[in-house]
C-alpha cells in the first residue's frame, strides 16, 4: 500500500547534533533519494542532492547543490550553493541558507515513488512578523524520468530547471550493489538519472552589495532542443570530506555521442593518498563503462588493477602548462595551476576511451585556506573536450569543478 514518508530537519531545533545518529541502509537497485539520516544529522555528516544544466557549447550553465549538514548552523540554515554563467562571461554565485529542509516520498516505501524536497525559510521571523517566503524545491518522478527544481528566492533567483533522463535503460543507471555506489568506504555518490537533457529558465538579480538595491535582473536559458544537457547527483556520508580526501575533480560533459559523469578524489594521508572515483560513461545513451576503481596513469597504460577480477576503471591526470608556452590558458585562482585533465575510461574487457578536458572559461572560485603561496580553494570551469575511443576525436563541452582542502 502506498504511503507518504516525511523527513524534516529544522536548523533552529535539535536536528544537528554531536555524536552518532541512526543511518538508514543503502538499498540496491534504488536511487536512494530519501534521506538516510531522517530526523537528525551529526556535525560531520552530510547529504547532497545536486542538479545542473549547460548549453551545447557550454556558453550558459547553471547548477544547484542542496545540502543537509552542519556547515550552515551559524548562518541559520541548511545551505544551497547556486551558480550561473552567461555566454558573455557574466557570473552569479551565492550560498543561500534555509531554516527547514523537508523531503517527502510517496510510495510503498521511502525508496520508491515520487520524491519532493523543500529547502525553505521559516514562515515567521524571530519577532513573529511574517517573513518573505524563500524556497528551493525539487520533485523527481517515480521512474527517475524527470526532475524539476523550482527557485523562489525574491531579489536573488526565481525560475526552474528541468532535467529529463535520456538513457534508454534507466535501470542501468542505478547501482545494483552497495559497492557500485561507493566513492570511498561509507561515502556514497551516485548519478541516478544517468545522461539527461536539460532545460532552464531562470531570472537572477544583481546588486552592488549583499541585500542592497537591485541594480539588474538577468535571464538565463538552457534549452534541450538546442543541445542542453546536464546531470543529477545524490550523495551522503557520516564522514566529513577532510577526513578522507584533500583533492577532488568533478565533471559532467557531452562529447559527441558520449556523456560522461565523474567524481575523482585523492585520499588524504589518513586514506593513504590513494585515488578513488565514481565514473560513468555512456555511448549513444547506453552505459559502456561504470568505474568505481581509480588507478594511476601507469596502471591504466598497463591495464593492471589491484584485483585479479576484470573491472571497469578510470584514470585521471592533471595537465600543466609548459613553462615557456605562449598559449593562452585558463587555470584556477589558487596554488594548483593545472589547465585541465586527461580522463581515461578502461572497461573490464580493456576497451578504452580517452578524453582531454581543458578549462575553457573560469566560473566560480572560493578559498579553502588562508592566502599565501600554498593557498588552496575550489574552482569551477566551463570545460572544452576532445576525445573518444581509438581513432575517434569528438568535440564537446561540460562543467567541471576542483576542490582542494588544506589537510595532509
From Swiss-Prot:
Pfam family for this entry, one: DA_C
Regions annotated as coiled coil: none
InterPro entries: DA_C
Pathway the protein acts in: Mycotoxin biosynthesis
Keyword Isomerase carried by entry: yes
Keywords: Isomerase
Tree of life domain: Eukaryota
Enzyme class: isomerase
GO molecular function, one term: isomerase activity
EC numbers for this chain: 5.5.1.-
Family that this chain belongs to: Belongs to the Diels-Alderase family.
Free-text function comment from the UniProt entry: Diels-Alderase; part of the gene cluster that mediates the biosynthesis of pyrrolocin, a bright yellow trans-fused decalin-containing tetramic acid with antimicrobial activity. The PKS module of prlS together with the enoylreductase prlC catalyze the formation of the polyketide unit which is then conjugated to L-serine by the condensation domain of the prlS NRPS module. Diels-Alderase gNR600 is involved in endo-selective Diels-Alder cycloaddition to form the decalin ring. Subsequent methylation is carried leads to pyrrolocin A.
Name the UniProt record assigns to this protein: Diels-Alderase gNR600
Higher taxonomy: Eukaryota, Fungi
Amino acid at each position: 500500500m502506498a504511503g507518504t514518508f516525511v523527513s524534516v530537519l529544522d536548523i533552529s531545533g535539535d536536528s544537528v547534533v554531536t555524536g552518532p545518529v541512526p543511518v538508514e541502509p543503502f538499498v540496491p537497485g534504488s536511487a536512494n533519494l530519501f534521506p538516510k539520516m531522517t530526523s537528525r544529522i551529526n556535525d560531520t555528516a552530510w547529504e547532497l542532492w545536486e542538479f545542473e544544466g549547460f548549453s551545447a557549447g557550454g556558453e550558459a550553465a547553471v547548477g544547484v547543490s542542496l545540502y543537509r549538514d552542519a556547515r550552515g548552523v551559524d548562518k541559520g540554515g541548511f545551505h544551497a550553493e547556486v551558480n550561473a554563467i552567461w555566454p558573455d562571461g557574466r557570473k552569479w554565485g551565492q550560498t543561500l541558507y534555509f531554516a527547514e529542509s523537508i523531503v517527502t516520498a510517496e510510495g510503498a516505501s521511502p525508496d520508491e515513488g515520487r520524491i519532493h524536497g523543500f529547502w525553505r525559510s521559516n514562515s515567521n521571523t524571530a519577532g513573529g512578523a511574517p517573513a518573505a517566503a524563500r524556497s528551493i524545491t525539487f520533485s523527481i518522478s517515480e521512474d527517475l524520468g524527470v526532475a524539476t527544481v523550482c527557485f523562489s528566492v525574491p531579489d536573488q533567483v526565481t525560475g526552474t530547471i528541468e532535467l529529463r533522463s535520456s538513457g534508454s535503460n534507466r535501470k542501468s543507471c542505478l547501482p545494483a550493489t552497495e559497492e557500485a555506489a561507493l566513492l570511498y568506504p561509507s561515502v556514497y555518490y551516485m548519478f541516478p538519472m544517468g545522461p539527461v537533457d536539460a532545460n532552464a529558465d531562470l531570472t537572477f538579480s544583481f546588486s552592488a552589495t549583499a541585500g542592497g538595491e537591485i541594480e539588474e535582473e538577468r535571464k538565463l536559458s538552457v534549452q534541450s532542443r538546442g543541445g542542453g544537457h546536464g546531470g543529477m547527483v545524490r550523495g551522503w556520508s557520516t564522514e566529513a570530506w577532510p577526513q578522507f580526501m584533500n583533492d577532488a575533480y568533478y565533471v559532467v560533459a557531452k562529447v559527441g555521442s558520449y556523456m560522461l559523469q565523474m567524481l575523482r578524489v585523492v585520499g588524504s594521508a589518513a586514506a593513504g593518498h590513494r585515488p578513488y572515483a565514481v565514473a560513468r560513461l555512456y555511448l549513444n545513451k547506453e552505459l559502456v563503462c561504470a568505474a568505481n576503481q581509480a588507478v594511476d596513469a601507469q596502471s591504466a597504460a598497463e591495464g593492471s588493477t589491484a584485483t585479479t577480477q576484470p573491472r571497469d576503471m578510470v584514470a585521471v591526470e592533471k595537465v600543466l602548462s609548459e613553462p615557456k608556452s605562449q598559449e593562452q590558458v585558463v587555470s584556477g585562482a589558487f596554488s594548483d595551476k593545472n589547465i585541465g585533465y586527461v580522463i581515461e575510461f578502461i572497461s573490464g574487457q580493456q576497451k578504452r576511451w580517452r578524453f582531454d578536458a581543458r578549462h575553457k572559461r573560469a566560473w566560480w572560485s572560493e578559498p579553502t585556506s588562508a592566502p599565501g603561496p600554498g593557498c588552496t580553494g575550489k574552482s569551477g570551469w566551463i570545460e572544452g573536450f576532445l576525445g573518444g575511443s581509438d581513432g575517434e576525436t569528438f568535440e564537446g563541452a561540460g562543467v567541471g569543478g576542483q576542490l582542494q582542502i588544506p589537510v595532509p
